From Swiss-Prot:
Alphabetic keyword roster: Ribonucleoprotein, Ribosomal protein
The keyword 4Fe-4S belongs to this UniProt entry's keyword annotation: no
InterPro entries for this protein: Ribosomal_bL27 (IPR001684), Ribosomal_bL27_CS (IPR018261)
Keyword Ribosomal protein: yes
Gene Ontology annotations for the cellular component aspect, listed alphabetically: cytosolic large ribosomal subunit
Record Pfam families: Ribosomal_L27
One GO MF term attached to the UniProt entry: structural constituent of ribosome
Region annotated Disordered, chain positions: 1-22
Family to which the UniProt record says this protein belongs: Belongs to the bacterial ribosomal protein bL27 family.
Gene Ontology BP terms: translation
Protein name: Large ribosomal subunit protein bL27
Length: 84
């Protein structure tokens, strides 16, 4: 007779890789055209002046300049712009 119960398989033990989301360039920082400013899921931050938006909602600089974060509109949305 076995003295130990047979070990069953567990259904846990998996974890996905982190996606490295978040702000990459902060307010006042100088950026070059093409620099990624924010990696995000959905539009937590919206594209302002001189900022483009990628297929995965990544915000990037369209021109050289300084990053500016601002809150505006009736919904208090966060916009990111590039100032010269």
């Amino acid at each position: 007779m076995a003295h130990k119960k047979a070990g069953g398989s567990t259904r846990n033990g998996r974890d996905s890789e982190s996606k490295r989301l978040g702000v990459k360039r902060f307010g006042g920082e100088s950026v070059l055209a093409g620099n990624i400013i924010v990696r995000q899921r959905g539009t937590k931050f919206h594209a302002g002046v001189n900022v483009g938006i990628g297929r995965d909602h990544t915000l990037f600089a369209l021109t050289d300049g300084k990053v500016k974060f601002e809150v505006k509109g009736p919904q208090n949305r966060k916009f990111i712009s590039i100032e010269d």
